[in-house]
Structure formats: structure tokens, C-alpha cells
């Protein structure tokens, strides 16, 4: 083996080992600091105590984070996938493609705190939605839209062209081909990208602080109510100082575990969908 190829191989192994070690150390350290706090009561009770969050649990924050994330996924994934379909299978004008791609790139570069400020000024105040899950979810949806669109567009480009051409050759319309051939074939990768985008939204603090997350709230019953969120709760615990540090580490571990579990489920689902499609 040439020395350059050998060096590249060793560098790849070293990088993989370093990244794995950092992730394991991060999870291990956070779990070690918060292990005494994590319990069934911590996961299922509401926060309490003279200093809010010092006692009790984080159940409303868990439910709130899931509500924020799920709503953002619905609002962000539909236009993202529609844009990707248009870019790959409908749009033939290079200038329009370049314009759309530039807009998507510009959106991806907007800081999350700016999106939060926009949602606060336009949705919370001008449209009088108030601080609620829907206001935050719109900001989060805008934030994750470029991520999902780019991943979906890449997935559509990797689809074997003969699959689409065969459908057209049989006289199938473009809409029929998209709905019955393309989307089922790419379902696994699309769902995986959507879930990963949701994980990105779950950890975003700035948009939630401005628009819908509050220090304390019960489990929300509608999208027009404010809610607790794990990033916001963690921020408040850290701001309170050393008395709440154990609870803060417990909250951080739960949030990291939810994100890791979502990533694993997305990966497993994508692989199983690919196998089923190849078999069929």
C-alpha cells in the first residue's frame, strides 16, 4: 500500500476514534454528574421547590419539547420536500434553480436568535398569536427547512434514473410517478432526514425563549398555549447557580438521550426501508 493511502487510512481511523471518544466522554460526564437526579419521579413529575426546578421533575418540559419538535417537523418538512421535488423533477430553468438554492442557503445562514426575534415581532405581537407552541414551531420550521430540503434533494438525485424513465415510458404521468414511485422509494431517507431535522430543532433554545417556552407551565392542551421545553428549562437551571446543577445535568442527559434515540431510530428506519424496497 502506498504511504499516502496508508496515511489517509490511519488518519481516518484516528479521526473516527477521536470523535467516538469525545461523544462517549460527553455522555459519560453528563450522566455521571446527573445520575443521582435521574429517576422515575424525575421523568414523570412537574418541577417544584422554592427555586423552581430544584425539586420535582421535568415531565412538562419533555412533553413540551416533543410538541415543539413535532409541530416544527410538520410545518417544515412539507415545504422542504415539495421544494426538493420541484428542484429535481419539475424545474428546468437554471436561473430559477440557482435563485431557489440561494434562498435556501441564505435561510440556513440566519442565526436562530434572529428567527426567534422575527417570530416574536411578527407572530407573537403583530398577528397577536401570543407566546405559544405554534409561534415557536414556525420559527423552528424555518430553521430546519434548509436542512431537510438539501437532504431530500440529495436523496432524489441518488435515485436510479432508469426507475423514473421506465415509469414515463409506460405512460405514467409525472404526478403519478412522484407519488407512487419516487416517494415510496425514498421514504426511508426522507423520514430519516426529517427526524434528524427534528433533533436539530429540539435543541434550539433561542427561538423558544422569544416565542413560546416559559419557565413553568402544565402539559399543553393546544398549540395556542405556551409550554415548557428542555433547552429553556436547562438554561434557567444554569442561570440559578450551583444549587440546581445536579438537576441541570439530569435535564441535559435526558435531552441528549432523546436526541440520540431519535437519531438511532432514524438510521434503523432508513436501513429497513431500503432493504424492503430492494426486496420488493
Task: Give residue spans per PLM region.
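Transmembrane alpha-helical segments of polytopic membrane transport and secretion proteins
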Residues: 1-18, 266-280
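Periplasmic/extracellular loop-to-transmembrane helix junction in inner-membrane transport proteins
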Residues: 1-11, 30-74, 236-246
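Generic hydrophobic transmembrane alpha-helix motif, especially the helices
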Residues: 105-141
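Transmembrane alpha-helices
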Residues: 151, 174-212
